[in-house]
C-alpha cells in the first residue's frame, strides 16, 4: 500500500511538472508571437506592405494581380475622403473601434457592419479574409496596437494601397488605372466616389461601368465626403 501511495504521488508530481512546463512554453510562445507581431506592425509603419495573404490567394485564383503602391501624397485627397465617408465616417474620432456603429450593427442584426477602416486594414495587411472567430480575435488584439503605433494618415495610406477595387486589382493606383485610365492623383470627385462605392463588394460592383445601385451609392458618398471635409472629420488624414 505504501509503495502504491508513493508511486501515485510521483505520478501526480510528474503530471504537475509537465503541466507547468507546458504552461511555460505556451506563455513563451505567446510572448514570442506577440513580439513578432509588434515588430511586423512597426515595420509596416514605415515600409510599403509587400503583399498580403488575400493578394496571394487572388494571384493563385486569377493567375495574376494588378497592383502599384503609391504614397498618400500621390492619391487624390477626394478619394481618401470618399473612402472614409463610405466605409468609416468617424475614422478620425475613434481608436480603432467605432462602438456606436458596432452597437447599431448588433441591434440591426447586421451580418456586416461596425468594422472600421482600422479593422479592415489589419484584416487586409496582416490576416486573412473569411469569417472566423480566430481571425476576429486576432483582429481585435492587433487593431489597438496598430492604432497606437501608426498615425491615422498611415492607416488610411495602407488601406488605400491594399484594398481591392476590382477582381485582382489592389490599391488606389491600380484601381484608378483599371477603371478610368488615370493615376490615383488625378481622380475626379465623381470617379473617387464610384471607386469608394465598389469597396464593399469589388467582385460584383464595377466603378468603370456602374450599375444604378453603384451610381446611387456614389452620389451618397460624394455628399458624405463633402460633409466630413466641412465638419473636420477628415482633418486627421488631410495634407
Swiss-Prot record:
Q: Name one GO biological process term.
A: peptidoglycan biosynthetic process
Q: In which pathway does it act?
A: Cell wall biogenesis; peptidoglycan biosynthesis
Any keyword Glycosyltransferase?
yes
Question: Which reaction(s) does its UniProt entry say it catalyses?
Answer: [GlcNAc-(1->4)-Mur2Ac(oyl-L-Ala-gamma-D-Glu-L-Lys-D-Ala-D-Ala)](n)-di-trans,octa-cis-undecaprenyl diphosphate + beta-D-GlcNAc-(1->4)-Mur2Ac(oyl-L-Ala-gamma-D-Glu-L-Lys-D-Ala-D-Ala)-di-trans,octa-cis-undecaprenyl diphosphate = [GlcNAc-(1->4)-Mur2Ac(oyl-L-Ala-gamma-D-Glu-L-Lys-D-Ala-D-Ala)](n+1)-di-trans,octa-cis-undecaprenyl diphosphate + di-trans,octa-cis-undecaprenyl diphosphate + H(+)
What top-level branch of life does the organism fall under? Bacteria
- Decide whether keyword Cell membrane is in the record: yes
Swiss-Prot/TrEMBL keywords: Cell inner membrane, Cell membrane, Cell shape, Cell wall biogenesis/degradation, Glycosyltransferase, Membrane, Peptidoglycan synthesis, Transferase, Transmembrane, Transmembrane helix
What kind of membrane protein is this, topologically? Answer: Single-pass membrane protein
An example of a GO molecular function for this protein is: peptidoglycan glycosyltransferase activity
Known EC number? 2.4.99.28
| InterPro entries given in the database record | Glyco_trans_51, Lysozyme-like_dom_sf, PBP_transglycosylase, Pep_trsgly
Location in the cell: Cell inner membrane
Q: What is its main location?
A: membrane
Q: Which GO terms describe its cellular component?
A: peptidoglycan-based cell wall; plasma membrane
Q: Where are the transmembrane segments?
A: 29-49
Entries under NCBIfam families matching the protein: mono_pep_trsgly (TIGR02070)
Q: Per the similarity annotation, which family is this? A: Belongs to the glycosyltransferase 51 family.
The protein's role, per its UniProt record: Peptidoglycan polymerase that catalyzes glycan chain elongation from lipid-linked precursors.
Identify this protein by name: Biosynthetic peptidoglycan transglycosylase
Amino acid at each position: 500500500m505504501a509503495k502504491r501511495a508513493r508511486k501515485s504521488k510521483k505520478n501526480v508530481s510528474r503530471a504537475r511538472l509537465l503541466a507547468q512546463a507546458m504552461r511555460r512554453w505556451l506563455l513563451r510562445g505567446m510572448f514570442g508571437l506577440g513580439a513578432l507581431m509588434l515588430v511586423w506592425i512597426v515595420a509596416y509603419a514605415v515600409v510599403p506592405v509587400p503583399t498580403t495573404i488575400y493578394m496571394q490567394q487572388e494571384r493563385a485564383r486569377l493567375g495574376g494581380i494588378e497592383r502599384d503602391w503609391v504614397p498618400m501624397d500621390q492619391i487624390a485627397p477626394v478619394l481618401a475622403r470618399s473612402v472614409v465617408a463610405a466605409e468609416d465616417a468617424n475614422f478620425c474620432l475613434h481608436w480603432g473601434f467605432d462602438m456606436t456603429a458596432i452597437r447599431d450593427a448588433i441591434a440591426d442584426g447586421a451580418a456586416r457592419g461596425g468594422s472600421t477602416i482600422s479593422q479592415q486594414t489589419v484584416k487586409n495587411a496582416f490576416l486573412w479574409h473569411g469569417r472566423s472567430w480566430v481571425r476576429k480575435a486576432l483582429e481585435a488584439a492587433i487593431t489597438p496596437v496598430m492604432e497606437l503605433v501608426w498615425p491615422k494618415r498611415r492607416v488610411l495610406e495602407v488601406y488605400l494601397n491594399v484594398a481591392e477595387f476590382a477582381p485582382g486589382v489592389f490599391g488606389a493606383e491600380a484601381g484608378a488605372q483599371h477603371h478610368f485610365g488615370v493615376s490615383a492623383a488625378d481622380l475626379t470627385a465623381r470617379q473617387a466616389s464610384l471607386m469608394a462605392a465598389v469597396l464593399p463588394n469589388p467582385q460584383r460592383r464595377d466603378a468603370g461601368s456602374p450599375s444604378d445601385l453603384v451610381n446611387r451609392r456614389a452620389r451618397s458618398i460624394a455628399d458624405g465626403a463633402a460633409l466630413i471635409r466641412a465638419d473636420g472629420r477628415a482633418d486627421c488624414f488631410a495634407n
